[in-house]
Amino acid sequence: PNNDMVFQLTDKLAFPDPHYGDPDGLLAVGGDLSIDRLILAYSNGIFPWYAFREELIQWWCPMDRFVIFPDEIHISHSMRTLINKGKYEITFNEAFQDIIQTCGELRIEQEGAWLGTKMMEAYTHLHEQGFAASVEVWEEEQLVGGLYGVTLGRCFFGESMFSLVPSASKL
């Protein structure tokens, strides 16, 4: 039942049923970015987002999601060639802070500055508790791409990525 409602969160650690969100997936506003709230949110398919240049946390739960199943990934010939060249080194959780900082750089022309200080701190706390991870792509010891996201059980929720050279974020 979609009633196009947006709920105001309180201090209570709870979310409304995602089916009550608006058609685009906006479910609620307010609340906080505590580890417990973030874990509850992601466990229910809900994620936080700040509207561009606004302070109010928005909680989203779109009904349609893009899901990648590892055993169904097809690596294109050109990507396989790039991997086999050995030009890049890939690491995990070696530079989480660098990844999130680079992802959070203000991109006013794209209205993509949702990853402000509060969000970066929240994801850093998740990382410190083992609930967020990063993937780094290096070229000659220079960070040239990467992504970070939330890890719960066997699921990884990719949040943001960047690439400073062609295809680095695809690796």
Over which residues does each language-model region extend?
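N-acyltransferase acceptor-side catalytic subdomain
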Residues: 1-171
